[in-house]
Amino acid sequence: MSKMAQKWDAYYRLMRLDRPIGTMLLLWPCLMALLLAADGMPDLRVLIIFIIGVVVMRACGCIINDYADRKLDSHVARTRSRPLASGEVTVAEALTLFVVLGLFAFSLVLLLNPLVVQLSVVGIILTIIYPFTKRWTNMPQMFLGVVWSWSIPMAYAAQTGEVPASAWWLFAANWCWTVAYDTMYAMVDRDDDLKVGIKSTAILFGRFDREIIGAFQLAALGCFIAAGWSGDRGLLYGLGVLTFVGFSAYQQRLIYGRERGDCFKAFLNNNWAGLSLFLALGADYAFAAL
């Protein structure tokens, strides 16, 4: 592989394009918000902008996260091969890529209404702050929940020009769900994080981690039900919620022994939980339109 090809491969990995799980976990609630806000028929232009925006902003988040953690990642088994930690990408190159992607994402929201633009400014600030919360709080996953739910009010604003009270049920559901699955993710790195001083809810919850994750899963379930109720959704969405319960139970089984590999499997399984909810919501709208 040529030096140029190696550099582009490093950029590709820096943006986590080789690991789309994070993009998918961001995408499902965003698409659900667009469906609920538009009563099942989102504007195609808005839909395309948000799909591209999710991919780009997830890449931005990964870059700024690796920048913040670059001196710590080399001490953690799972992260020591990341491009910044390994030296494949320089700090200047990473920050330049972050700015370019951020400006591109901002240019997308400029195609939408002023409220979306205002919300996007808050979103980019939250994205920049998040990686540093792991230094000063034991609850960075709770901050991440806000960051990863921010596309929801933006989606409502893009479709309706406002953020109605009903939008916050989906926001709350996704916040609780994010805290649950990112705590599973943090359980994978818990031993290494303790050594290097990174804080997480997996460390904070300690031996009660499984029970507290379960409580967040239950809270997410209740809020997903409320979000569907506020949108007058029917049986098919309800079946999707039941599927979410099944996935959550399976994840609890996986994390029972707190083995790294199983905790990571539980985290990955949340992609299917999100997909099932989105498909159920879409099917519910499609059936109602018959």
UniProtKB/Swiss-Prot annotation:
<keyword id="KW-0831">Ubiquinone biosynthesis</keyword>
<keyword id="KW-0808">Transferase</keyword>
<dbReference type="InterPro" id="IPR030470">
    <property type="entry name" value="UbiA_prenylTrfase_CS"/>
</dbReference>
<feature type="transmembrane region" description="Helical">
    <location>
        <begin position="97"/>
        <end position="117"/>
    </location>
</feature>
<feature type="transmembrane region" description="Helical">
    <location>
        <begin position="44"/>
        <end position="64"/>
    </location>
</feature>
<comment type="function">
    <text>Catalyzes the prenylation of para-hydroxybenzoate (PHB) with an all-trans polyprenyl group. Mediates the second step in the final reaction sequence of ubiquinone-8 (UQ-8) biosynthesis, which is the condensation of the polyisoprenoid side chain with PHB, generating the first membrane-bound Q intermediate 3-octaprenyl-4-hydroxybenzoate.</text>
</comment>
<dbReference type="InterPro" id="IPR000537">
    <property type="entry name" value="UbiA_prenyltransferase"/>
</dbReference>
<keyword id="KW-1133">Transmembrane helix</keyword>
<keyword id="KW-0460">Magnesium</keyword>
<dbReference type="Pfam" id="PF01040">
    <property type="entry name" value="UbiA"/>
</dbReference>
<dbReference type="GO" id="GO:0008412">
    <property type="term" value="F:4-hydroxybenzoate polyprenyltransferase activity"/>
</dbReference>
<keyword id="KW-0812">Transmembrane</keyword>
<feature type="transmembrane region" description="Helical">
    <location>
        <begin position="143"/>
        <end position="163"/>
    </location>
</feature>
<keyword id="KW-0997">Cell inner membrane</keyword>
<dbReference type="InterPro" id="IPR006370">
    <property type="entry name" value="HB_polyprenyltransferase-like"/>
</dbReference>
<feature type="transmembrane region" description="Helical">
    <location>
        <begin position="21"/>
        <end position="41"/>
    </location>
</feature>
<feature type="transmembrane region" description="Helical">
    <location>
        <begin position="235"/>
        <end position="255"/>
    </location>
</feature>
<dbReference type="InterPro" id="IPR044878">
    <property type="entry name" value="UbiA_sf"/>
</dbReference>
<dbReference type="GO" id="GO:0006744">
    <property type="term" value="P:ubiquinone biosynthetic process"/>
</dbReference>
<comment type="pathway">
    <text>Cofactor biosynthesis; ubiquinone biosynthesis.</text>
</comment>
<protein>
    <recommendedName>
        <fullName>4-hydroxybenzoate octaprenyltransferase</fullName>
        <ecNumber>2.5.1.39</ecNumber>
    </recommendedName>
</protein>
<feature type="transmembrane region" description="Helical">
    <location>
        <begin position="168"/>
        <end position="188"/>
    </location>
</feature>
<keyword id="KW-1003">Cell membrane</keyword>
<comment type="similarity">
    <text>Belongs to the UbiA prenyltransferase family.</text>
</comment>
<dbReference type="InterPro" id="IPR039653">
    <property type="entry name" value="Prenyltransferase"/>
</dbReference>
<dbReference type="GO" id="GO:0005886">
    <property type="term" value="C:plasma membrane"/>
</dbReference>
<feature type="transmembrane region" description="Helical">
    <location>
        <begin position="270"/>
        <end position="290"/>
    </location>
</feature>
<keyword id="KW-0472">Membrane</keyword>
<feature type="transmembrane region" description="Helical">
    <location>
        <begin position="211"/>
        <end position="231"/>
    </location>
</feature>
